[in-house]
């Protein structure tokens, strides 16, 4: 069975070599609200494994893609938390994040920083306790900041990685017949 937030939930006949990803593919994949990071395999009513498709897509890691057995249930959970990451990252997009993800792991999901990124100037727009938008400026290179706060992300946060400055300092322009 493939159930939960998938396009075509139901019972499927698969080959004995099929894995969780095969079952997800045959069911049409997750819906818009279906999680790509929390896909559970249940066998005889017990949780056996959780598949994170981001690991497959970004790292080619298939270690949690279990082979299916007769009577298994593949359950696609709903997305719990998403953040937007844009600016000087390789793959700007909206990403599903887990509660354990911080700003560094989210930027890693986005392919890492580009060569034009300024890691000392990352802006995180979040909602504070009073449901007001607040902007935090984060320096990813500051070791003290890393130690005291891992910059946990919340649902709806927006991360913007700013580019290095285009201005030059201490530059001498020489013109004319030199």
List the model feature ranges, each with a label.
Residues 1-178:
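Ser/Thr/Pro/Gly-biased, low-complexity, turn-/loop-rich segments
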């Amino acid at each position: 069975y493939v159930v939960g937030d998938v396009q075509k939930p139901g019972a499927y006949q698969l080959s004995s070599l099929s894995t969780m990803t095969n079952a997800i593919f045959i069911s049409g994949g997750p819906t818009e609200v279906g999680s790509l990071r929390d896909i559970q395999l249940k066998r005889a009513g017990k949780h056996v494994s959780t598949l994170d498709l981001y690991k497959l897509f970004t790292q080619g890691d298939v270690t949690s893609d279990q082979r299916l057995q007769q009577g298994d249930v593949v359950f696609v959970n709903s997305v719990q938390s998403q953040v937007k990451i844009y600016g000087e990252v390789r793959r700007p997009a909206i990403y599903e994040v887990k509660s354990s993800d911080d700003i560094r792991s989210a930027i890693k999901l986005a392919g890492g920083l580009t060569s034009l990124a300024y890691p000392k100037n990352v802006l995180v727009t979040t909602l504070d306790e009073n449901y007001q938008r607040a902007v935090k400026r984060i320096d990813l290179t500051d070791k003290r900041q890393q130690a005291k706060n891992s910059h946990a992300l919340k649902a709806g946060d927006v991360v913007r990685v700013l580019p290095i400055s285009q201005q030059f300092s201490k530059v001498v322009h020489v013109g004319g017949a030199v």
